[in-house]
Amino acid sequence: MQSYQQPLRVGVGGPVGSGKTALLEALCKAMRDHYQIAVVTNDIYTKEDQRILTEAGALEPERIVGVETGGCPHTAIREDASMNLAAVEALARKFGNLEVIFVESGGDNLSATFSPELADLTIYVIDVAEGEKIPRKGGPGITKSDFLVINKTDLAPYVGASLEVMERDTQRMRPQRPWTFSNLKKGEGLQAVIDFIVERGMLGARA
């Protein structure tokens, strides 16, 4: 049986349209020259996110696997993560030297969490367009994720959201836990996410 190393598994969750796939695209493009990376995407009835990442050239196509969960996206990353666990293992065996596998959940609500059997680190993505109240609504995605990304800061003036209020509420809801504002269209906030993955994942910084 072919041997392989156990990669760091990073779960990326968040509501539909918050920017999970955009974050993954940016992470892959920024990290692929320094680390061996693969991605597992989750969609309920299609493999749309796999297609988006492939067409964007985030990674070589064979490094991106799409999983059709066929039901509640929450179940596929927590209660019954078997399909995702199988996809992760298949990628790890195929390449042998993977260092990071990102697992993107299907769009879900604030209660979404990853099974510890599936993800070593979790990143949760919300966006300003959902309203400034989102951080204080809480839920495991906000309070228990290892890293929180508040995306689309450029939309704040258009939706009447106060970034100051969101910052205050975020610090109150997840004291001592890291987070960042981001505008992924401009790459703002991306480095903070990378630094977190490298440091907490003990990957070792590489130029």
Curated annotation (Swiss-Prot):
For the keyword Lyase, the answer is no
**Alphabetically, which GO biological process terms does the record hold?**
urea catabolic process
Residues annotated as binding GTP: G14, P15, V16, G17, S18, G19, K20, T21
- What are the annotated GO cellular component locations? cytoplasm
UniProt keywords (A-Z) are:
Chaperone, Cytoplasm, GTP-binding, Nickel insertion, Nucleotide-binding
Molecular-function GO terms, alphabetical: GTP binding; GTPase activity; nickel cation binding
Name the SUPFAM superfamilies on file.
Answer: P-loop containing nucleoside triphosphate hydrolases
Where is the protein localized? Cytoplasm
Keyword match Membrane = no
Origin, by domain of life?
Bacteria
Q: Which InterPro entries match?
A: CobW/HypB/UreG_nucleotide-bd (IPR003495), P-loop_NTPase (IPR027417), UreG (IPR004400)
What does the annotation say about its assembly with partners? Homodimer. UreD, UreF and UreG form a complex that acts as a GTP-hydrolysis-dependent molecular chaperone, activating the urease apoprotein by helping to assemble the nickel containing metallocenter of UreC. The UreE protein probably delivers the nickel.
The family line of this record is: Belongs to the SIMIBI class G3E GTPase family. UreG subfamily.
Q: Which NCBIfam families match?
A: ureG
Role according to the record: Facilitates the functional incorporation of the urease nickel metallocenter. This process requires GTP hydrolysis, probably effectuated by UreG.
Among PANTHER family, the record links this protein to: UREASE ACCESSORY PROTEIN G
Q: What is this protein called?
A: Urease accessory protein UreG
Give the species.
Answer: Pseudomonas putida (strain ATCC 700007 / DSM 6899 / JCM 31910 / BCRC 17059 / LMG 24140 / F1)
Q: Which gene encodes it?
A: ureG
